[in-house]
Amino acid sequence: MFDTTPHSGRSTPSSSPSLRKRLQLLPPSRPPPEPEPGTMVEKGSDSSSEKGGVPGTPSTQSLGSRNFIRNSKKMQSWYSMLSPTYKQRNEDFRKLFSKLPEAERLIVDYSCALQREILLQGRLYLSENWICFYSNIFRWETTISIQLKEVTCLKKEKTAKLIPNAIQICTESEKHFFTSFGARDRCFLLIFRLWQNALLEKTLSPRELWHLVHQCYGSELGLTSEDEDYVSPLQLNGLGTPKEVGDVIALSDITSSGAADRSQEPSPVGSRRGHVTPNLSRASSDADHGAEEDKEEQVDSQPDASSSQTVTPVAEPPSTEPTQPDGPTTLGPLDLLPSEELLTDTSNSSSSTGEEADLAALLPDLSGRLLINSVFHVGAERLQQMLFSDSPFLQGFLQQCKFTDVTLSPWSGDSKCHQRRVLTYTIPISNPLGPKSASVVETQTLFRRGPQAGGCVVDSEVLTQGIPYQDYFYTAHRYCILGLARNKARLRVSSEIRYRKQPWSLVKSLIEKNSWSGIEDYFHHLERELAKAEKLSLEEGGKDARGLLSGLRRRKRPLSWRAHGDGPQHPDPDPCARAGIHTSGSLSSRFSEPSVDQGPGAGIPSALVLISIVICVSLIILIALNVLLFYRLWSLERTAHTFESWHSLALAKGKFPQTATEWAEILALQKQFHSVEVHKWRQILRASVELLDEMKFSLEKLHQGITVSDPPFDTQPRPDDSFS
């Protein structure tokens, strides 16, 4: 059972509510001393060791503060023992594998088991050039160190050919089978990426290495900027240059690909690659087949290593070297619609294409999941006002979501190209393990390419307070509004879960399951409401156009527009609406947005209508059979009741004897019947007596046989026989 309090058991002791209340009771004249430059102080620890009182402060208060500091140190040691920081894990890694080069630094470690005669539970440590495993079961230590250059094959396996939680690592002389992974796919991708870099003799820069560490362990590592080549975590809030954002996105694909594979939509990061890469899980299990599919990264190495190495992972960043195109040009980062759904209105194609390219280069989609990718028949400015202003649409949408205490601050900023605002509201929570509601603080940052640009990008960071493990994570969303035409705009919404501290695998899976469920429900509801607003807007525009056209016909009747006598025609507000082309790129919006010009039943497939008719006919037949069965049962019951009534009526209406002769005849018949019955009973009794006699005779013979065959019971000589 998980702790449902806002502060979980894995949070640091200094973040508990009781600890903060005690800190507030400390006198303001005694600030904690600053640590020396050469020392590091963990969060929640207190290095104050002064014993002297401060003038004007009661001695009881100083004694209480010293006791509190002592208790906080005990809690800090207890917390460090249960949840060691990255610094402690790295020190343990260097102690356990002291023969490795000193330049090797721990990137991530996973809990797993090595399959041998028995399962050896331990931890798998990954560095830039080595894979290490350590297990200690009742002083029985097992240590394995594998250099990545020596690995010839890397496969995903199944424990007992059923549970997909194992990885097999093969070298020229050995095979190691690691199982019981909590995040097998993520670990496999990271090992595969490091293996590729080792075979290609590529090294990670300090920035890339520390970004991987922060992705795996969070931002609180127990380190400072004075520890060797430590690099602080980079905040991906869209303020960096395109080159920096691209570099970091390429690295973050490693840790986020596990979540992207479970998404129904194709990953936006994967779609930005210059070539189509094979599926990693399929290609890595069959390395030779993967070598035939992708030949862009072959090197002259060992046969097995080169064949396995040439498989490019899904999250591979594009190479800077010029390569020959393998086939037709793939879609750009924003052209995710199939060819039959591409827009036919090319009046503003050049400007919209340039704007899409600029926005895609500046702020690409987040590396989590693409939740909305739809084209609406609404202008970009109007769509922005509907979503990011105090509009009736937003108010109605928040009321439908049952959000309360909504506070929208106005946009503030130096220019129209970069603005910021903060939203606060309370959301309902249906999770039985948590509270019924939670307060939310959402920070929105708006970016534009220019003051007159039609499109914009809004980054949103949502912090939910009052829920379990609130200090571990927060959610980030990116809204990208692109103006395609005067009355058309594309809305792309991507989301990801960002971690401040790395939780346990079980807690992380619980956080991701609940968070993604709520995020997907919210944005699917938003997409449906936008589709309804779009339909209402198109209907109102069609009515206005028809009213204007009828007025023109009344004034100029000879100039009435007719097409071969089919009736008056009027221009549609949009060519795509007239042709019935649905330009939405999301699967849910295709089912939730019917075409405007279609009839009430035109959007229903004929197969669905046929199935409905068959089901209705089957139900009618079943009802008729049930009625017939009920009638048959009722008829049988009524017939039986009728027969019984007739028999009783016949007895009731029978004629009784009137004279003495008739009574004498009846008495004679009764005596005769009685004598017959007595004779029958006598025969039955006589037969019973005969059977009893036979049984008695048999039992007597059996008793005689038993008495003769049994030996005498008294085998000991009697005492009086010895004297005779």
Swiss-Prot record:
Expression by tissue: Expressed in liver.
Pfam family membership, one: GRAM
Biased composition (Low complexity): 1-18, 326-336
Locations listed in the record: Endoplasmic reticulum membrane; Cell membrane; Cytoplasmic vesicle, Autophagosome
Stretches that traverse the bilayer: 610-630
GO-annotated biological processes: autophagy; cellular response to cholesterol; intracellular sterol transport
Top-rank taxon: Eukaryota
Domain GRAM intervals: 91-158
Stimuli inducing this protein: Up-regulated in hepatocellular carcinoma tissues.
GO annotations of cellular component type: autophagosome; cytoplasmic vesicle; cytosol; endoplasmic reticulum membrane; endoplasmic reticulum-plasma membrane contact site; organelle membrane contact site; plasma membrane
PROSITE patterns in UniProt: VAST
Biased composition (Polar residues): 57-66, 300-312
Disulfide bonds: none
Membrane topology per record: Single-pass membrane protein
Domain VASt: 367-538
Broad class of where this protein is predominantly found: endoplasmic reticulum
GO molecular function: cholesterol binding; cholesterol transfer activity
Biased composition (Basic and acidic residues): 563-575
Region spans: Disordered: 1-66, 256-336, 560-579
Protein's name according to its UniProt entry: Protein Aster-A
UniProtKB keywords: Autophagy, Cell membrane, Cytoplasmic vesicle, Endoplasmic reticulum, Lipid transport, Lipid-binding, Membrane, Phosphoprotein, Transmembrane, Transmembrane helix, Transport
Function field: Cholesterol transporter that mediates non-vesicular transport of cholesterol from the plasma membrane (PM) to the endoplasmic reticulum (ER). Contains unique domains for binding cholesterol and the PM, thereby serving as a molecular bridge for the transfer of cholesterol from the PM to the ER. Plays a crucial role in cholesterol homeostasis and has the unique ability to localize to the PM based on the level of membrane cholesterol.
Record text about domains: GRAM domain binds phosphatidylserine in the PM and mediates protein recruitment to endoplasmic reticulum-plasma membrane contact sites (EPCS) in response to excess cholesterol in the PM.
